[in-house]
Amino acid sequence: GENEKILNVKVEAPEEEILRYLDRKVITKDNPMTTPVLKEVVADAYDRLIAPAIEREIRSSLTEMAEDGAIRVFGKNLEQLLMQPPIAGQVVLGWDPAFRTGCKLAVVDPTGKVLDTTVIYPTAPQNRVEEAKAVLKKLIAKYHITLISLGNGTASRESEQIIVDLLREIPVKVQYIIVNEAGASVYSASKLATEEFPNFDVGQRSATSMARRLQDPLAELVKIDPKSIGVGQYQHDMNQKKLTEALGGVVEDCVNRVGVDLN
């Protein structure tokens, strides 16, 4: 608010009490010639130099305390995201929703291997709902999909409605879960994703990430800069060095706690 020039925050202090205290400390002998001048000097020094310096120090201390508290919350949020229990033994359909460019799909087997990818256009402006349902039914039947992992971004609600309608129409039991897709776009355009899926476009990588986030959240999310995972608001207002160190420490702790498969 202050940066936008909308709010003005000040620290109010008992000025009269402070000036009386300073007068007693500075003016040791009452002299009708010097006392008035010294009082003016004390008042000017307090108003112009001492009070602003103390206010800056207090606000800096409070800001640091607030930042430390916020960073702790961000760390807890990140830990909860990383330590979500994995869902094993399921063939998952990752669904990266969108409007104009279509919804990207990726079928992933229980080991995380990508079996198939495609794009459907059930949302506006194309609204090719029946065509999309036909594609989905074929994928479910062919790969025995048991779980749909739907990203919570743009067109998520519209995609969810299509999934709900589809599940009513098919005889097999398939469930769906909405997952947080924060950081998926960052990962899908990263060098790591390009090396992992050199023949996939950004949409295919993002849909794959949606599926794998359900299967093994920790293994998938460690590929992304912790600040891009969506651990809280106003991250950019924090001390970036402290935030990076804190979130990096959380990632290390979680990986150490779970362990790493060297194979």
Could you describe each region identified by the protein language model?
Residues 112-145:
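Nucleic-acid-processing active sites and adjacent nucleic-acid-binding tracks
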Residues 86-114, 214:
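Gly/Thr-rich phosphate-binding beta-strand-loop-beta motif of the actin/hexokinase/Hsp70
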Residues 1-91, 110, 133-138, 142:
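Extended, highly charged clamp/arch subdomains and adjacent linkers
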Residues 124-126, 175-216:
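Short alpha-helix plus adjacent loop in nuclease-associated cores
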Residues 195-263:
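Long, highly charged, low-complexity intrinsically disordered interaction regions
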Residues 95-99, 153-158, 179-186, 227-240:
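A glycine-rich phosphate-binding loop feature that marks nucleotide/adenosyl-phosphate handling sites
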Residues 19-24, 102-110, 119-120, 159-162, ...:
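Short acidic, glycine/serine/threonine-rich loops at helix termini
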Residues 7-10, 146-155, 177:
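Short glycine-rich phosphate-binding loop at a beta-alpha junction
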